[in-house]
Design a protein with these regions (language model features):
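Alpha/beta catalytic cores of nucleotide-metabolism and tRNA/nucleoside-modifying enzymes
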Residues: 1-31, 111-112, 176, 183, ...
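Bateman/CBS regulatory modules and CBS-like beta-alpha motifs in cytosolic regions of diverse proteins
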Residues: 36-53, 58-60, 89-131, 136-138, ...
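Active-site-adjacent beta->alpha loops and helix N-cap segments on the catalytic face
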Residues: 37, 86-95, 155-159, 204-226, ...
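Short beta-strand/loop segments at the ligand-binding rim of alpha/beta enzyme cores
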Residues: 50-57, 104, 228-238, 278-293, ...
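Catalytic cores of alpha/beta
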Residues: 67-70, 244-254, 293-311, 355-370
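Glycine-rich phosphate-binding active-site loops on the catalytic face of alpha/beta enzymes
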Residues: 74-89, 258-268, 307-325, 355-389
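Catalytic beta/alpha-barrel core
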Residues: 80-85, 110-111, 133-135, 174-175, ...
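Terminal amphipathic helices with adjacent charged low-complexity linkers/tails
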Residues: 83-98, 140-158, 188, 197-218, ...
Length: 490
């Protein structure tokens, strides 16, 4: 069969009753004037959460905590902190990501002009602050100056008041509320200032930019860091479909960009009720729901208010859902059906699971997904949770397990809820656990996947993701064709 445009290709497959996954298809090369460096990979994770690179890390306890989420955001993607943590533990992980790049300190620690230097030092010791710069307020809470490390360094009398050694407000460059990180950078460079207080219309402190962080964000990331409007890394968190969901999101809300309702069956009354509760309680927060594998399910969730749909039931390398239960659609067909069903609703699809090779990422995006979620492709790296295990033969491995594996169901209430475990006896496991080779830093993996996606889109002549999704033509490939596609006869 010749290569067909996407609509015709999937209609033919549908008419034949054939459902496809990544190894069943390849994409046709086209005349191209687009170099890999020119490709724009900007996309969205959910309705209001942007991506510079269409990658996300799976909410699994052997894949994503803060280290992985930080790495993903620095490469333009987003990490979803798993829910197999207590609320306090998940809060700390989310906060660690959000404050990793503290471009704008929204609520800076302040001191009063009437306090002594010794009193300030005592507070620093008590609260374990490792900084010594503070906006200074008067009795009416108005900004009157700035206390910095040099004021401590050159003071011989710690009983002196803050106001006697601080730099007064009249000598400090400041900016209004709403100043962007780039405008702040320009102002700080022009005036050679390391701190830039933001003041509201009444003269009260409303934020503080720190030059070291601002400079790192503006200059050091080549436009790849996925940051919010305040220059902080974007991060998401998984929540279970139970009574703790609202409390969990309420605890995380200050630092959270998106909540992901994590269920093996997203088209269920439990997911519906959790989505309804979260949208009512947090109307401005994006809520992604998953997982589903049919267009009807995706549209139903979107019409109930979901801001993104996670597609994939059973495609993961450590998932046994399809084998144990007989349900689920091969992933390419599932993504296609969900994308088609969501037309006109402006709700992105996340292709979750089944990515085995870098080329699969491009296929998922061409099929219509706005991003891909990866587990195995990121597991086994330094940034994945867990210790490196040294084997007797000298090799190094890390643990990788599905959230439906026996040990995950035993260890995590969120995992048990995700897989609908109830009743008596041992729960049905829908995943396995294994050790996988230690891969080193995930940054090397992400760099590889980024280059592969750009190269793929260049072969097709797609300068951006919208063009990739609109113009790519598909082949149905045979098993022999797939064998030929890999290295062979060597």
């Amino acid at each position: 069969m010749p290569a067909l445009d996407k609509q015709k290709f999937f209609k033919v497959m549908e008419a034949e009753g054939v459902a496809l996954t990544y190894n069943d298809v390849r994409m046709e090369t086209r005349a191209s004037e687009v170099s890999p460096q020119e490709v724009d990979t900007t996309s969205r994770f959910s309705r209001h959460v942007p991506l510079r690179m269409p990658f996300s890390s799976a909410a699994m306890d052997t894949v994503t905590e803060s280290a992985m989420a930080i790495a993903l955001a620095k490469y333009g993607g987003i990490g979803i902190i798993h829910a197999g943590l207590t609320i306090d533990e998940q809060y700390r992980e989310v906060r660690r990501v959000k404050l990793h790049l503290n471009g704008l300190i929204e609520n800076p620690m302040t001191v009063y002009g009437s306090q002594t230097l010794q009193e300030v030092l005592d507070i620093c010791q008590e609260k374990q602050f490792d900084f010594r710069s503070f906006p200074v307020l008067d009795a009416k809470e108005k900004f009157v100056g700035l206390l910095t490390q040099k004021d401590f360094d050159f003071s011989t009398d710690l009983s002196a008041t803050v106001e006697s050694v601080m730099t007064p407000a009249a000598d400090i460059t400041h900016a209004p509320v709403g100043t962007s990180i780039h405008d702040a950078y320009d102002t700080m460079v022009k005036n050679k200032k390391k701190k830039l207080p933001l003041l509201d219309s009444t003269g009260k402190i409303a934020g503080l930019y720190v030059f070291s962080d601002v400079s790192r964000i503006v200059n050091d990331n080549s436009g790849m860091y996925n940051v919010d409007k305040n220059g902080r890394l974007v991060v998401g968190a998984a929540v279970p479909t139970d009574e703790t969901a609202v409390d969990r999101v309420r605890a995380l809300e200050k630092y959270l960009d998106v909540a992901v309702i994590d269920s093996a069956q997203g088209d269920s009354k439990y997911a519906f009720s959790t989505l309804k509760l979260l949208k009512e309680e947090f109307p401005t927060l994006d809520i992604v729901v998953g997982n589903v594998s049919t267009g009807e399910s995706a549209r139903r969730l979107a019409e109930l208010g979901a801001d993104g749909i996670k597609v994939g039931q059973g495609p993961g390398s450590i998932c046994t859902t399809r084998i144990e239960t007989g349900i689920g659609s091969p992933q390419v067909t599932a993504v296609w059906q969900c994308v088609e069903a969501l037309k006109g609703l402006d709700v992105p699809v996340i292709a979750d699971g089944g990515i085995q090779e870098p080329g699969d990422i491009s296929i998922a995006i061409a099929t219509g997904a706005s991003s891909v979620m990866m587990g195995n492709m990121l597991a086994g790296t330094s940034e994945a949770p867990g210790n490196v295990i040294q084997l007797a033969d000298g090799s190094s491995v890390k643990l990788y397990r599905g959230m439906g594996s026996p040990s995950a169901l035993r260890d995590s209430a969120a995992a048990r809820k995700r897989y609908g475990v109830g009743g008596i006896g041992q729960p049905l496991a829908e995943g396995v656990e294994a050790t996988i080779a230690y891969k080193g830093s995930v940054t090397e993996m992400l760099d590889h996947y980024t280059k592969a996606l750009r190269k793929s889109m260049s072969y097709i002549g797609a300068a951006d993701i919208a063009t990739h999704q609109k113009t790519t033509r598909f082949y149905r490939i045979t098993n022999a064709g797939m064998v030929e596609s890999r290295t062979h006869d060597i």
